[in-house]
């Protein structure tokens, strides 16, 4: 089946047809590194990591570019307020974003260009726009002229006369609708030499130049948060048109993380930093939560919703841990016991439908429930093979979403949830099995009080006992 994605520009689902067969080129607007990241910032990283994973699962080679905006009005303001050099402020928060992406298991991009490293490319791009009659320099600033650019407004659907670029009038602007590509130097601010005088980049020219530098004049998909649709992405596309580039063939935008119906943002003061949220759940559980809603939907944050998502992930994790013990007879968490298998056709069908993750997760949990029923039966060779096949399907599906509990990224977390180190787990297994033997003897003698006492004591210690056809099994709660 062909992947269909919602193209913001077309306002409809479109079949994904890459420019080059077997290859996908993607540009994601990355972080403006002005502050530590909150969960709203990293949702796009998770959402489009899932896109990348799915394209790769379908056999495509993916070139994935995610930029860093390391020079910006907000960065300069924050650095000045904190009496820090702008470059140090930007570098500190770039590291914080990369830490957050790593914590959430987001695959590193093919390349992560910084704006400050691409000023020559921006200068060349602006010169092309000026030469083509769509831009001009005035008092050290360089402006683009939307009124002269074909199809301006195609992405946001706004009319030119009604647009607000969110800029001041600007020195030398010929038309208030023009937007800034390059800002003239100001005292105390970083500046670079250009044919029009010293200055620094505007926000929009950075991405147009970096995207085409690495992906060419035309590429497959441009991604980013819904809040970037206008003016940023509209102006990126306009600059590309003005320069003579085809630019992105598909535009994808993810919804916001909201609190009480409002977008999570520093200005509203309703942010939840990644370190603070990770005090409530494990990194993989936060990733599961951020990826669990459809990428175009708003994701309303609450601790209850976060907890429900974490519980959903743990059901998958617990099934795989139990499946390993069922197949091997050992409690050690060994991923090789359950090789990654084939994905069910129903899962692929849901993912091909504009990355319908909620429905895809429903498929995973249906398969987990099927597997759990088998785990309650006596472990015959035939039953073990069935469990391996089902577990392999679960792993394959979870891997696409970046939440396979037995993957290298999450294996240590899974081992810890299953009881810590192999040595500690082995010791605990001996002790618990001794208690379970005492309980079995009590049950055989119809000493129900003692049997219940053993079970209750184990429960108080965080150990859950499940009676199966092959005897009592135990696992750690939560």
Curated annotation (Swiss-Prot):
Please report, in chain numbering, the residue ranges of the motif 'KMSKS' region.
263-267
- What EC number(s) are associated with this protein in UniProt? 6.1.1.16
Primary localization class, coarse: cytoplasm
Cofactor(s) it depends on: Zn(2+)
One Gene Ontology cellular component: cytosol
Show the SUPFAM superfamilies listed in the entry: Anticodon-binding domain of a subclass of class I aminoacyl-tRNA synthetases, Nucleotidylyl transferase
Instruction: Look up the domain of life of the source.
Output: Bacteria
| SMART domains, sorted | DALR_2
Where can this protein be found? Cytoplasm
Q: Where does Zn(2+) bind?
A: 29, 207, 232, 236
Co-factor remark: Binds 1 zinc ion per subunit.
* Catalytic reaction list: tRNA(Cys) + L-cysteine + ATP = L-cysteinyl-tRNA(Cys) + AMP + diphosphate
Which GO MF terms does the UniProt record name? ATP binding; cysteine-tRNA ligase activity; zinc ion binding
Q: Where does ATP bind?
A: 266
Q: Which GO terms describe its biological process?
A: cysteinyl-tRNA aminoacylation
Task: Mention any Pfam family matching this sequence.
Answer: tRNA-synt_1e
Q: Which UniProt keywords apply?
A: Aminoacyl-tRNA synthetase, ATP-binding, Cytoplasm, Ligase, Metal-binding, Nucleotide-binding, Protein biosynthesis, Zinc
Q: In which residues does the motif 'HIGH' region occur?
A: 31-41
For this protein, the record's InterPro entries field holds: Cys-tRNA-ligase, Cys-tRNA-synt_Ia_DALR, Cys-tRNA/MSH_ligase, CysS_C, Rossmann-like_a/b/a_fold, tRNA-synt_1_cat_dom, tRNAsynth_Ia_anticodon-bd
Protein family according to the UniProt entry: Belongs to the class-I aminoacyl-tRNA synthetase family.
> Which HAMAP family has this protein been placed in?
Cys_tRNA_synth
Share what the entry says about its subunit structure, partners included: Monomer.
Q: Which NCBIfam families match?
A: cysS (TIGR00435)
Q: What is this protein called?
A: Cysteine--tRNA ligase
Q: What organism, scientifically named, is this protein from?
A: Corynebacterium jeikeium (strain K411)
